[in-house]
């Protein structure tokens, strides 16, 4: 202290430093208070927002509807609080540069006053419920870089003025309700690299300026109504386009060659359009391409050999086109391929052995083509293969045991000469007692030793001998025909004498001897009269195989056609019990049930059932095995759904019978596309073990109700579940045996409806009719989901389904006309009189 008194200047120095420290602390405290006063957590440069920006934000708030209270911070306080406390607002030097309010539940509209935010760079309001139009004033914002308005309810057209934003880089207006054409001016921004306008209702052509943009790396226009040809993609130098998605539109014409010259392309999808012509071979020169989808078009020609050069390709989907020719042998060069879908084309030749070299492949679908030969053994080495389908080809031979154990029978159906894929379709045992069939090697050796040139005399003698043999064969055939005709005339004379008794017998059945073949033929009613010999000597054509047996189309000698089902041996009940059950089935008559006309018991235990022949085949083939040019309108689909429902309701209410195996394959269609339920009651003819196998097969095809895993018994409610699956099949065009994204058909439909994308459920063909039948489609979908409710008690009765379908679409005079039999005839009166 004494020292300080001695040095007064030291006192002044200490006082000065103390005051300076206090002033610095005060300034720091003041700055911190201003910066943190709003409590909004946003950084702020300390400059107050301009009055124009403040008024614009107030106008924006006024037109938005704040359902969740997120805009409470946008109060009427001074403009000094905007940048530091208002939710979703970011500023720079007193100017609003970003509005970020995604997933906030905001409704209302976007004010045109947003154009007053002259420094706005980013507008992010996606995943809300905002309606109205896209503000035209966005085109005034010269600093705008990103617009994210996807997943809202915006309508109207895309403003042309957006092309006036020179710095715009990302424009995403997807998943709205926008209409009109795509403005060609959008690509006037020299920095636009990402454009997403998918899932709207845009129409008109794809602007040439968009296709020829020098800056776009991502272009997604899927699920719109765009039409016309795809313009040439200008290629002169380096173009950065990596992703192109144009699927689910109405583009026509050929795939432009110039598109396949964008060397940086990684993903191309142009599925579900109307493209034609062939695939350009230049598409095989894209070194970075990972996914290529040309499915559901009318593309023809062959798969280019150049595709084997796509070394980065992971997924190739060419489903539902008109491609022909073989699969290139060098396909195994696609080392990264995990999915190959060539379903529903006209591709022929053998399945290449080289596919077995693609070790990473997970999904392989070659169904509904013209492949021949055996299934290559090399496919058993594909350890990652989880989805495999070669059904409905012309394959032959045994299925490799590894594949038959790993995949169910639906993967191999429709190949008549294929065997070993299920217990009901075993391969025949090898025959060790061959007839005189020489192998190529053994037949050539003797010819080398005994070969000599035939003389003219030898040739004449051989020709005369052959002619005599042919004449002798013709005489034998004529003699057999005369004998058969006389026998038939005698039988007809006998029938004429007893015709009155036959008519009075009605559906009770009339038995006749088996003729020369033996056995017993029992007729119910029907338009045709034939003998056992006529039936057994008819020209037969296999229509399909099932757990019950093999179905044939039989053409009788007089040209009439019937359907014959040969039941599998050792699966049916004893003769006495069998006849009692089959006689009861022969009495059932309804316009939507396939009528049993006769049955035959052979001398060796064979059992044949005779039905009306349905010219249009099964509903499954009608829906899934047609070409893209064959359209099925909603009127026809609803007619089929009503017919199935009526037939099932009659079985439940009038016959007290459960079908137990209702599938689209068991719904047959006549010439007028009337539905006839087949295979009802056949389980009553089977042993208990065989009937259980039938129900298990129905489950593998996706028609089995979930409660089967516990109760193991069929009921009227399990039939209604199967009916619901078939109605979903009619609505979606999808087969229930083909899982979508790992979900079965009801789960997939429910997931789409839950996301409020209900229109995505319906078959693309039906979407063209939505303006006239949109309500019918939605109401039928609700009914189908009711039928497939996991709880049996929640499902309606079959007769309730009939009533609701008739309420959804009342009958017209045309729809009420029915065709009694597949081939017409007198039987129409019988069916009409027996209808209840």
From Swiss-Prot:
Regions crossing the membrane: 459-479
InterPro entries per record: Kinase-like_dom_sf, Leu-rich_rpt, Leu-rich_rpt_typical-subtyp, LRR_dom_sf, LRR_N_plant-typ, Prot_kinase_dom, Ser-Thr/Tyr_kinase_cat_dom, Ser/Thr_kinase-like
User: Which residues face the membrane's Extracellular side?
Assistant: 34-458
Topological domain ranges for the Cytoplasmic compartment: 480-836
Which residues are the signal sequence here?
1-33
Q: In which tissues is it expressed?
A: Expressed in meristems, including roots, vegetative, inflorescence and floral meristems.
The record's annotation in Pfam families points to:
LRR_1, LRR_8, LRRNT_2, PK_Tyr_Ser-Thr
- Domain of life assignment: Eukaryota
Region annotated Disordered sits at: 430-450, 805-836
GO MF, one term, reads: ATP binding
List ligand-binding residues for ATP.
Answer: 543-551, 565
- Recite the UniProt keywords alphabetically: ATP-binding, Cell membrane, Glycoprotein, Leucine-rich repeat, Membrane, Nucleotide-binding, Phosphoprotein, Receptor, Repeat, Signal, Transmembrane, Transmembrane helix
According to the UniProt record, one GO cellular component term is: plant-type cell wall
Its UniProt domain note says:
The protein kinase domain is predicted to be catalytically inactive. Lacks the conserved Asp active site at position 661, which is replaced by an Asn residue.
What's the protein here called? Probably inactive leucine-rich repeat receptor-like protein kinase IMK2
State the species of origin. Answer: Arabidopsis thaliana
